[in-house]
Amino acid sequence: MARKKIREYDSKRLVKEHFKRLSGKELPIRSVQINETTDLNELVEKEPWLSSEKLVVKPDMLFGKRGKSGLVALKLDFADVATFVKERLGKEVEMSGCKGPITTFIVEPFVPHNEEYYLNVVSDRLGCSISFSECGGIEIEENWDKVKTIFLPTGASLTPEICAPLVATLPLEIKAEIEEFIKVIFTLFQDLDFTFLEMNPFTLVDGSPYPLDMRGELDDTAAFKNFKKWGDIEFPLPFGRVMSPTESFIHGLDEKTSASLKFTVLNPKGRIWTMVAGGGASVIYADTVGDLGYASELGNYAEYSGAPKEDEVLQYARVVIDCATANPDGKSRALVIGGGIANFTDVAATFNGIIRALKEKEAKLKAARMHIFVRRGGPNYQKGLAKMRALGDDIGVPIEVYGPEATMTGICKEAIQYITAAA
């Protein structure tokens, strides 16, 4: 499971659309999204309610405590909303120690209300927890002792008996309505593969639940079965995290292929760089470097898997090598080309792309004093490793090559020994 945060606009869009599908009832949620590409005149034409009602506007940037930070404006007309957005769009703010520009806003009707309730559903390995409180809103943390929580093991149904502790203290006139709302939201949570869904607060409008503020996370590994349900979903980067051009390039490659190609720069001046086959293996290699005390020297996180084509590996390897060899400073560096034992990926075929990239970047590798460490196993691995050994002689770059007889992460220790001995 990969938990990915989505914008409030998308959370509300999914809840509104699928609440009706699953319950037959309409949630009167209305909201629009504004970013730098939005034509405000076209937006008002498409959503006439924007010009006839009082509005709420706030950043939609995956961070909380917007109200406490003075980033929520209430009871505005649309002209005031436009001014609010213009004054803040692209401006940098700091939230919980993270700095970044505000790029996206959500606008919705202002809903006068007295009651504020809290609802949260979150999944973990063993099941789902559902939390509810009659004291929701911006002071929820101060009133956490009033939050009630139940746990449902995986596969269990949310029956009235199980739900009863959550709504036990509600007035009778609203108890059934809120209980039914919680049950539908839980069904929707599972149906859409949410991993986290929080409404803080939701209120009652004409006796029916109405979510005012919402946060959501989806299991993005379930995208293959939910692409129609999710629609045009966006998984934004965490607030304060901006992709570099090289990361954006790899992200574009990843979106176009059935394989997996991941790349994140951790420290541009790092002296240990990785290019690892397999999602699990890539994390193990990175953790091993950290466990050995050299996390500060780890330049990147990189993972390729799912039998990428040779040309895809070539483009991917070019980017990794360019970053690993940038700005040579006379200090030695290490490139770890690792992986476990593949099940179906042709090791020699994927190595072909890496070898082509290494040949192209021969001069850069030498200028950066790069030492390469290789460890791999799987189909056709002997041929792939033989090509790697021959490559070292061809381009005059030191390459240490190991097969499955060596421990998977042993080359991490060798890489560290190399950069420290040559320092």
UniProtKB/Swiss-Prot annotation:
The keyword Transferase applies. Expressed in trichomes, epidermal leaf cells, anther tapetal cells, stigma and in young vascular bundles of expanding leaves, cotyledons, roots, pedicel of flowers and siliques. InterPro entries: Citrate-bd, Citrate_synth_N, Succinyl-CoA_synth-like. The keyword Nuclease does not apply. Transmembrane segments: none annotated. Plants silencing ACLA-1 show a severe dwarf and dark-green phenotype with some seedling lethal plants, reduced leaf cell size, altered cellular ultrastructure, altered plastid ultrastructure, hyperaccumulation of starch, increased accumulation of anthocyanins, chlorophylls and carotenoids in vegetative organs and decreased accumulation of epicuticular and cuticular waxes. These phenotypes can be complemented by exogenous supply of malonate. This is ATP-citrate synthase alpha chain protein 1.
